[in-house]
Amino acid sequence: MYTLNWQPPYDWSWMLGFLAARAVSSVETVADSYYARSLAVGEYRGVVTAIPDIARHTLHINLSAGLEPVAAECLAKMSRLFDLQCNPQIVNGALGRLGAARPGLRLPGCVDAFEQGVRAILGQLVSVAMAAKLTARVAQLYGERLDDFPEYICFPTPQRLAAADPQALKALGMPLKRAEALIHLANAALEGTLPMTIPGDVEQAMKTLQTFPGIGRWTANYFALRGWQAKDVFLPDDYLIKQRFPGMTPAQIRRYAERWKPWRSYALLHIWYTEGWQPDEA
């Protein structure tokens, strides 16, 4: 067992609930007190389990034997997924009143940027539950089942999805253009044109993402938020955000959000998940 540290406050109930709502069957298992999933690091495969210890402000990580040779990489992935490097005092200090209601919110990341890109594309114009079901179907068809844990499937690699038949993907329940967008994303990952870690210029990288088939501004921003764990992303034209700022245009909302730099990703989360929040007079 390995142990990672985090700074309180941390709303583990919210984080695990967020991940549970999006959990991909046969890839992830989420319960009230733990998170488990299949994981691939290079040629190594296995299952990782994360168990928060609220009293000690630690996260216990169990790795199956197949992942032990790449333990450091696995721990780094878990740290990014759960945003363990966040200093909530600094973030909440910058957010002011906005951060007061839910000071333990963290930015859910991911264990792999390509996987998050696939999930972001499959989440377009469908419910959270439907997106998880679609992703599970893709994983069942193109993922690799673990010999030691046959109940788990490793998320499909870029190589597998790049070679996919778009009609076979369409048959899973998605539009053909979305299937083609997945294949293009897989090829971009293989060619190195999809950054796997946060790029130096996030704004430019998001603009580049929008040149990919099937990726618009919202998807590019959401991918930056979760795939790269970019800390300063805001979505002024998001449906719920526009509801929270009645009577304001996206340009006005963007200007209002400048006050939360360089932590606008956290501001976005707080606005999404704080019922009844209203902006101050601009």
UniProtKB/Swiss-Prot annotation:
Induction context: Up-regulated by methylated Ada in response to the exposure to alkylating agents.
Enzyme class: hydrolase
GO BP annotation list: base-excision repair; base-excision repair, AP site formation; DNA alkylation repair; DNA damage response; DNA repair
Keyword Signal: no
A GO CC annotation given for this chain: protein-DNA complex
UniProt effect for mutating Q124A: Methylmethane sulfonate-resistant
Signal peptide residues on this chain, from the entry's feature table: none
The enzyme's E.C. designation: 3.2.2.21
Cysteines engaged in disulfide bonds, as pairs: none
Superkingdom of origin: Bacteria
Function of the protein: Hydrolysis of the deoxyribose N-glycosidic bond to excise 3-methyladenine, 3-methylguanine, 7-methylguanine, O2-methylthymine, and O2-methylcytosine from the damaged DNA polymer formed by alkylation lesions.
Name of the protein in question: DNA-3-methyladenine glycosylase 2
Organism: Escherichia coli (strain K12)
